[in-house]
């Protein structure tokens, strides 16, 4: 075949890994779909319910009322089976919707309505069991099984309070089988802690020898995988701030369920929970939402506030750096910078190849943001590339891309081998904060190193930046190029209005109702405004981006300097 085999054309070392995973998957699927496997999962039937795990995430009663009225609204899409309709026997609007539906993340919204919601939750759970109680690759796959086990375990007592004896037996038996299947899944380190936690929550909820054995096995697994999932400084190994919040919620739920059973939580659990609580504190910005990097969303304020309620040291000052991120703060400005490489290998399924990206808040409101991509957003994989972040790019090149085709189907949409290195150095003084960052993601293709310097003046209350492209290649460019174009992007929050000044070098950024705003000035050759999109709570919102364009001579390099300052304290450009 021209161009080599399919395996030869796959990117990097991921080819061999993808082939191995695909070869192992088919026999495994045949086993889990067999009668013998169903009997294996059914061993050690639970005798009843023990703990009542409490999911500490806030519920949305209005969403529960929509379900009672006959409509599931998930991820911005709607399925309307009607009152007491069956959502399981009809096609979902999209695969993404089906994932959210089968995860049962909507169950807390129903239970927030009391007995009426619990009755509907019981009916929907039994309908699911009749349709999907036997294994299939989608509804019993790890993408949905992990969250469904957690959600059903937390809902079990409320549902069973209205169940007949036969329905009660069905619910606890299904929960036990699903949790046992969850412990069988071995897809590498990514989400291993989340799977073990969900299985342990189910084990804590189930009474009798079957529940106790399930709990013991899940806790053994959790003790083993937690150190790899939570970094020593408290971040999630994926470098996704939202992942840290979600795992903190799950571990807090498990800690509470173990306490109900009179059991002491393992030291590994308590230590990880303490470190994750510190990460939640670090990533919570002035608007009460999260910094949105590496596949994490900013989330709703109430959601983040609920996570912070679990932090016994919430009043402690947060460190200036954590998990590869830096925070810089003055009176009115708050800056977060991504100063590390994306997570490697299996941890990168939600990672973004966007080195040195920043987010900026002005007076507690988002001003400069990233694209806001997340695995649950209705966004293209292109939103994980460098152009979708507030950083610099050269030509039309990417610093890394998600796997595609066969490799993506086998391994998930992890980033292809990321070879670039990121360096950072920070200095602090009474009058200002300096952060110097650099990465060599453009070195192989262009012979250039991107260096970004940030200075936040504490007294002046302004942010100064310099993006420099420094040559690292002593020989001529192999392609014979002398110049290549570069772009420095600033994606704006969808609530920000932008206007280019008459000098064509400055852009006025204003929030609605703000009389002054902020000037973004630069010495770029060309300054333009172009359309952009920002994903918030998983939904696209049209916005704009400021582009600073120029040309870099490969033998000499180039730089562009810019400054963000309050329009209330600065003269307007002429």
Report the location of each language-model feature:
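Long, acidic, intrinsically disordered low-complexity segments
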Residues: 39-65, 78-112, 191-204
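Short strand-coil-strand connectors
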Residues: 75, 329-333, 363, 395, ...
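Extreme N-terminal leader/anchor segments
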Residues: 1-82
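Residues that flank catalytic or metal-binding motifs in active/ligand-binding sites
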Residues: 102, 324, 356, 388, ...
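Carbohydrate-active enzyme catalytic cores, enriched for enzymes
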Residues: 200, 231-373
């Amino acid at each position: 075949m021209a161009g080599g085999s399919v395996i030869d054309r796959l990117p990097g070392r991921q080819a061999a890994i993808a082939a191995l995973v695909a070869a192992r998957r088919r026999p495994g699927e045949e086993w889990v779909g067999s009668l013998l496997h169903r009997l294996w999962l059914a061993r050690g039937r639970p005798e009843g319910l023990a703990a009542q795990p409490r999911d500490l995430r806030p519920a949305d009663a209005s969403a529960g009322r929509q379900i009672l009225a006959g409509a599931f609204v998930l991820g911005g899409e709607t399925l309307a089976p009607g009152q007491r309709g069956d959502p399981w026997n009809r096609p979902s609007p999209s695969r993404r919707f089906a994932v959210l539906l089968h995860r049962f993340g909507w169950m807390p919204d129903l239970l927030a309505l009391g007995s009426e919601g619990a009755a509907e939750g019981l009916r929907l759970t039994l309908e699911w069991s009749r349709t999907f109680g036997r294994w299939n690759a989608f509804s019993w796959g790890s993408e949905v099984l992990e969250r469904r086990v957690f959600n059903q375990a937390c809902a079990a007592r409320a549902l069973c309070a209205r169940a007949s004896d036969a329905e009660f037996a069905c619910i606890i038996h299904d929960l036990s089988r699903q949790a046992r299947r969850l412990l069988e899944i071995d897809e590498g380190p990514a989400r291993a802690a989340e799977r073990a936690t969900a299985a342990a929550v189910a084990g804590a909820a189930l009474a009798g020898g079957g529940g106790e054995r399930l709990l013991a096995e899940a806790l053994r697994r959790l003790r083993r995988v937690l150190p790899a999932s939570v970094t020593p400084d408290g971040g999630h190994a994926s470098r996704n701030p939202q992942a840290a919040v979600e795992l903190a919620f799950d571990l807090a739920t498990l800690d509470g369920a173990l306490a109900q059973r009179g059991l002491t939580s393992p030291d590994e659990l308590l230590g990880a929970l303490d470190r994750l609580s510190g990460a939640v504190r670090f990533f919570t910005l002035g608007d009460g939402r999260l910094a949105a990097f590496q596949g994490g969303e900013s989330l709703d304020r109430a959601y983040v506030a609920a996570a912070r309620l679990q932090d016994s040291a919430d009043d402690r000052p947060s460190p200036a750096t954590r998990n590869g991120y830096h925070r810089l703060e003055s009176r009115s400005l708050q800056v977060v910078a991504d100063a590390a490489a994306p997570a490697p290998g299996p941890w990168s399924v939600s990672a973004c190849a966007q080195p040195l990206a920043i987010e900026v808040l002005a007076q507690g409101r988002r001003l400069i943001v990233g694209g806001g991509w997340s695995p649950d957003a209705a966004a293209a994989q292109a939103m994980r590339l460098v152009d979708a972040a507030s950083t610099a790019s050269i030509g039309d090149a990417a610093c890394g891309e998600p796997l595609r085709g066969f490799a993506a189907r086998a391994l998930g949409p992890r980033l292809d081998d990321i070879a670039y290195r990121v360096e950072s150095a920070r200095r602090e003084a009474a009058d200002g904060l300096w952060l110097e960052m650099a990465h060599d993601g453009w070195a192989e293709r262009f012979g250039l190193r991107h260096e970004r310097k940030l200075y936040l003046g504490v007294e002046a209350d302004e942010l100064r930046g310099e993006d420099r492209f420094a040559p690292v290649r002593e020989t001529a460019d192999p392609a014979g190029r002398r110049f290549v174009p570069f772009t420095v992007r600033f994606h704006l929050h969808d609530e920000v209005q932008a206007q280019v000044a008459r000098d064509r070098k400055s852009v006025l950024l204003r929030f609605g109702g703000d009389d002054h705003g902020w000037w973004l000035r630069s010495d770029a050759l060309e300054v333009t405004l172009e359309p952009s999109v920002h994903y918030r709570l998983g939904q696209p919102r049209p916005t704009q981006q400021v582009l600073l364009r120029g040309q870099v001579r490969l033998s000499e390099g180039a730089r562009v300097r810019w400054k963000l300052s309050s329009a209330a304290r600065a003269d307007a450009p002429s």
